[in-house]
Amino acid sequence: ELLAKANLTKELALSFPQRNGFFYGLIGTEMHEVEIDGKKYNRSKGWNTYYWGNSNRNPYTWNPKESPYHILDMSWTALLMLRWYDELEKDARLLAYAEDYAMALLGIQYENGFFPGWLDLKTMQPMNHLNASPETSLSVTFLLKLYELTHKEEYKRAAFKAMNAVIHEIIPVGKWEDFETYWSCSRYGSDNLVGKKVLRNNMHKQNNFSMFWTAEALLECYRLTSNKEYLDYGQRTLDELLMTQASWQPPYMYVNVLGGFGVLNADGEWNDSRESLFSELIIQYGKLLDKPEYIERGYAALKASFVMMYCTENPQTKQQWEKVHPFFASEDYGFIMENYGHGGRTNPAGEGMGEFTIYDWGNGAAAEAYNRLLDKFGKIE
């Protein structure tokens, strides 16, 4: 049953239409409002109203049907296709789809090495934001994976050119700006800070996603070249990332947060689901550099990714959930919020616990990380 669902997900991804190699980031349906027992709810009109669209976490529109193509999202999806091809099954369609995208990606790389942030939905031309950002790092990882599988030099050349741009323009000044820095849950500065430092502290508004993508790309560059400069920059970037990991248990946090990750230097979340994504990379650096602290931090991040789950194994968390949602019972086991303290406030009565669950940014992501680490590194204590 699980394999069937996984294969359905693969088929869905492959069904996304490509336009000159580029492709949409989501499928959605038309919605409408219904009233049940006096309360109003948003409900889908059904799959017969489906449309292709893109993430609305962008500077231009909240409407996913009108949102532009996001290079980062496409590179991430294509990278996952390559990992499936490499690690699970040699489905040639995955490689072909990713390579069609890669050729389009090479065609829009700037002379300075960066890739654009977004492409206009109609003209397919680069838009006005994040055209020299560390989002480029994820495309580096994708291109290097494709080079590993095809041995085509053009992918490697483009990847190293992009990586060097990030090394010279982003890392020295901590310009960790990506879509989530300004156009997701914390929009502070989106009107006047993009590309600029805050005068008060001489820092950019920063998001640790960019740090992760860059540390990951630098590790892949090192693996291909054995050039220690890439490893040194990677460790430097990883250390910045680890500054956003909780290394203590504050008394004003009412669930376990040790090992969990925050998000921005201008937002409130703790125990964010990204810790499940980060854990493998941290452990990889730890094993490569023979640094037990990194390995410990990586496994702590993995464990933290399960902390928000409503289940008997998390008695402290379970108690908090039941305070804020008294109707929770055994049929709700497995429910997990993407983070803790999303609104910037917590209290003993359950404030900060949240109200929704996202499978691939919560319980599913945590389970995936556990299984990947189990496969790669063996039994997890």
Predicted feature descriptions by range:
Residues E1-E381:
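Glycan-recognition and catalytic cores of secretory/periplasmic carbohydrate-active enzymes
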